[in-house]
Amino acid sequence: MKGTSSSNNSVVFLSSPVDSFNFRSSFIEDTPCDLYVVVAPNLIKELETYLNKGYKIDCFIPYEVKEKVVNNVTGIIKGKNPFLPPLVLTAHFDHMGKGLSGEIYRGALDNASGASFLLELSSFLASLPQPSRDIIIVSLNAEEFGLLGSKNFAKENKDLLKNATVINFDMIGSDKDIPLTFMAGEDTCFHSDLLDRLCEICNEKNITNIIENKDSSDHASFIKEGFDAITINDGDVTRIHTPEDKIEYISPTAIDRSFSVVWSEIFDSAYSSSGLFLLDSKVLILLILSALICLILKLRS
């Protein structure tokens, strides 16, 4: 159902399947309408009644629109061979902020989880020997405004990132019982070697996973510039963009699952020739037990 805004632009009213909700959408600058309002089913009927009687519904967005310059935050771990295409690791750090009543949309899953995951992963990689290729770490801004940070970064650095592989983290660590989601682009004709490798890693580790062809995270910006890019997430949208997106719903086990998959890919891509050994947990346990047995035998002798 359409109405009018105070600036004489169009407003769309959408009927929700439930009567109570706190979901807030992202702010997208290039949508055909000024405002989309989700209302309860009984309210949509009431609005229709008033419109049919000739009433006018005035709407406004209680936010001031300003042009701002915001920044992505970028770091790099230099590789041994500058001629190899880089590996790019990304996550957006913006969130929905506050509601009209002052309630905080904390964004624990979307996307403090991905931003924190990227920070810890970066710290871990920085502690390792030098990788074979550059690893570029980017904390992206303004994802909730239409992937603006990633659009700018991918476009402005297209030549620098030539043939790069991009792994984006968005909503990591929801529930270990939810399949791990690999989000590829909407264009199903685009073949992703990265996606093939990630699925193969999951098969080797018996990790249930699904593939979604959506452009709803920052991987889409890189794909549109010709890069092989995938978003890894846990596919749980039950609390995101609501005040209930809190840290108590984050699962460390699910985060470990994501790390297990990502580290295997990063190791093969950037560390397999550096002298590091990638050990399966069972192999590591056997090695530790063997070392303990040898130590006990030596002490007894």
Regions of interest found by a model, annotated:
Residues 17-21, 66, 81-82, 93-97, ...:
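Solvent-exposed loop/turn segments at secondary-structure junctions
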Residues 1, 31-38, 61-63, 101-111, ...:
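Second-shell loop/turn segments in exported
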Residues 286-301:
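Alpha-helical transmembrane segments
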Residues 172-286:
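Active-site-adjacent substrate-binding region
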Residues 24-106, 127, 132:
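Soluble metallo-hydrolase cores and metallopeptidase-like ectodomains found primarily
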Residues 10-14, 74, 87-90, 136-139, ...:
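Structural recognition of the beta-strand scaffold that forms the well-ordered cores
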Residues 1-36, 205-208:
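Extracellular/luminal Protease-associated
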Residues 69-72, 82, 97-189:
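Acidic/histidine-rich catalytic neighborhood of metal-dependent amide-processing enzymes
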